[in-house]
């Protein structure tokens, strides 16, 4: 099981709250649970693997990835942006690169992801473990598989 870096107390090292439709708290060194939803047609199993590969490609360069679960209509990620990269910049990169490459693969154009993502700062080891369990079981919950460890969209360090 991945280990949480250190407990987070609300207010410590906050660098601001931004708001569009959802509030987004930025905190240096924080671990985030993020959900991004598709605006386009659902991903095929092969495309799920493709998007997973795009997210894995940024690990250790732009963010430290703890876990991801790519579903046909959304993805969840547990990650910590690397120094010099905000969560906003990381998500823009993940969604932008995956959209361009998937649109090229599909021979289509347009936005793949909804503009805004949901994010939450993970506060402690217990919450980290709860989020990993939720992500792991997500494909079982929606009926995509009975064996979550073999689902193509799953990755955990």
Per-region residue spans from a language model:
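Short catalytic/metal-binding and nucleic-acid-binding patches
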Residues: 1-157
